[in-house]
Amino acid sequence: MRVVILGSGVVGVASAYYLARAGHEVTVIDREAGPALDTSFANAGQISPGYAAPWAAPGVPLKAVKWMFEKHAPLAIRLDGTRFQLQWMWQMLRNCTPERYAVNKGRMVRLAEYSRDCLQALRADTGIEYEGRTGGTLQLFRSQQQLDGAAKDIAVLREANVPFELLSPAELKNAEPALAAVSHKLTGGLRLPGDETGDCQLFTTRLAALAESLGVKFRYNTPIDALAIAGGKIAGVQCGSETVRADAYVVALGSYSTNFVSKLMKIPVYPLKGYSITAPIVNEAAAPVSTVLDETYKIAITRFDQRIRVGGMAEIVGFDKKLRAARRETLEMCVNDLFPGGGDTSKATFWTGLRPMTPDGTPIVGRTPVSNLFMNTGHGTLGWTMSCGSGQLLADLISGKKPAIQADDLSVHRYLNEVAGQTRPAYA
């Protein structure tokens, strides 16, 4: 089968790889000059299935009000003048109940755990290298309230059989030796030893090369204008003056997916703006060895070979990609507070990207009401974590195979109501 994939981020490239491995003739189209040059370029570097959780959580609405008055708040909201933004935020609020949080987190962990299994198999099969580490993830708590609040996450981890360790301040150094110097600032930590880290952009670039070796064609610097529709099906992709035709089409355009398919259906994927800095390591003993999550500031600090990546925060501001100095200040403050002297933040590069987020946190993967159109988008902050599993799942669906995990609650249909032949957003 001929398959066209729109988007060459980590999700699109993973989809291409698994589809090609299944025997399909795959073409990837992207406006950028190469793979992973947008949202996948400088993310936090985490592969964290156990920390797969929706931003829509109990207590978040009240926290959001509090964060409005804090200098280093992890969340900021600025109205972008669109009705869609207001609808999306309302849908997100509807998912902040304990019941919805448990459902959403459960299916996110399911996909993320499966994706890690797919990544491990990929690594065993191909030997792909991307500055990867398997030292786990350590979530740090700065207050007793945060530590107590982790109980609901631990319950979900137990139910999903995800290994974890609850560490006292004195035990944190066993996972991250450099934290011994700052343990007095912390009340404890939750460690997931099965999590991994690495450079997502490097991973995506090398996976694209592997996909090319399987026959995948990458068409970069190519405009993606619209979907051509005929007889209730997709007849092609309009790319400038050319129409590219296939048997099946996959939309993996991240935050841009919503506008691209708006004439066919309304999907609630909104850009959640995040930031990162990448600093050279100057003192190995003072640097992290894997990934640390600061629960207070919602910031991840990740070790690469000779670099430290610090990323996080969320701004609901539309498609604004302006770099804001105050956000860099927060990232530098966080890493220097926990790992003083480990990296030279004065020499750090500064980046921002738009994560494609759904109101319930779960990505949209699978079939759509249009028979030959498939979606693989809306992974939020977990694009790399879920990429391999999403790609394999999509390849199975397109190939007519039963996926290895439950997939019906991942499709766009959880958000669509059929009304007189039209589709409109519904609550997940």
Curated annotation (Swiss-Prot):
EC assignment: 1.4.99.-
Keywords: FAD, Flavoprotein, Oxidoreductase
Taxonomy, superkingdom: Bacteria
Catalytic activity as recorded in UniProt: a D-alpha-amino acid + A + H2O = a 2-oxocarboxylate + AH2 + NH4(+)
Positions annotated to bind FAD: 3-17
One GO CC term, this protein: cytoplasm
First-tier enzyme category under EC: oxidoreductase
Gene Ontology biological-process annotations: D-alanine catabolic process
Pathway: Amino-acid degradation; D-alanine degradation; NH(3) and pyruvate from D-alanine: step 1/1
Keyword Ligase: no
The keyword Acyltransferase appears for this protein: no
GO MF annotations, alphabetized: D-amino-acid dehydrogenase activity
Named cofactor requirement(s): FAD
Biological function: Oxidative deamination of D-amino acids.
Family: Belongs to the DadA oxidoreductase family.
PANTHER family: D-AMINO ACID DEHYDROGENASE, SARCOSINE DEHYDROGENASE-RELATED
Protein name: D-amino acid dehydrogenase
Taxonomy of the source species: Bacteria, Pseudomonadati, Pseudomonadota, Betaproteobacteria, Burkholderiales
Gene behind this protein: dadA
